[in-house]
Amino acid sequence: MKIVVIGGSGLIGSKLVTKLREQGHEAVAASPKSGINTLTGEGLAEALKGAAAVVDVSNSPSWEDSDVMKFFETSTRNLLASETAAGVRHHVALSVVGSERMLESGYFRAKIAQENLIKASSIPYSIVRATQFFEFVKGIADISTEGNKVRLPHVLFQPMAADDVASAVGKVAMGTPVNGTVEVGGPEKFRLDEVVRRGLAAWTDSREVVADPHARYYGIEVSERTLVPGDDARLGETRFETWLTLPASKAAAAALVHSFPVPLAFVVRRLENSRSMLPPILPARPTAALVKTRPAPRFARG
């Protein structure tokens, strides 16, 4: 079966392409690098010829609210139109658990808009919502650090390995469209501060993790269950303590990336607008240089 993976060169996409090929499928890694651009429509018609399914794990290259909305709406419309013309019978999209509970962020408003476009189309579909990845635990610490303290809300957290995300998406893509949403998460529930504390300890990082009821998660106010899936979620196999011993853990610890699809500029604006109400998780006077030099935060969709 031919399956086209949009965003096929990213963290999840590259793993997914490998897994699909191991199962004997013709998996096409589609991205601007390979001449396939969903935002402009370039290369889509040719790439989708003969495809039975399309999996979209792509992400916006810009993190401004208007740019993110434009990316997801435009690319999804282009993709769905091309799929209709090519006769694709299964559209799979990777989204985020709790998106509808985090509409304070323009990114999640855009993800909901993407989901709504998919639901309104005539193409059978499956939306896979995943929890945060183990690979980005360090990024959560980095963006929540002041001095030597990491301040985080003491809320439930059910992260999973990126490899398990790719496996879950692959199983859905190879199956029958559910015409609905599938949630996937890790095999264990933790408290957010607990996961970060364990990760930093494993990486011999001396920062102190503090559970702060007033702390926000990337500038977003979260409640007890904002970040966890429902009880019927499909669970990955990799436990956090096991993952911490793997090469992926060491690579994640060494990487300077931010781990959630909320741009630093958004966090800065939230803090500047509500300084007295928020914990000091960023310098008191964020500068343009800081915004420009920090890598783009991401919940790696691709």
Identify the role of each PLM range.
Residues 165-169, 184, 192-195, 243:
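Non-catalytic, hydrophobic alpha-helical segments
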Residues 181-233:
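Terminal hydrophobic/aromatic helix or amphipathic segment near a protein terminus
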Residues 2-21:
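N-terminal Rossmann NAD(P)H-binding glycine-rich loop of SDR-like oxidoreductase domains
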Residues 22-86, 97-106:
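NAD(P)H-binding glycine-rich loop region in Rossmannoid oxidoreductase-like domains
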Residues 225, 232-267, 281:
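Amphipathic terminal alpha-helices
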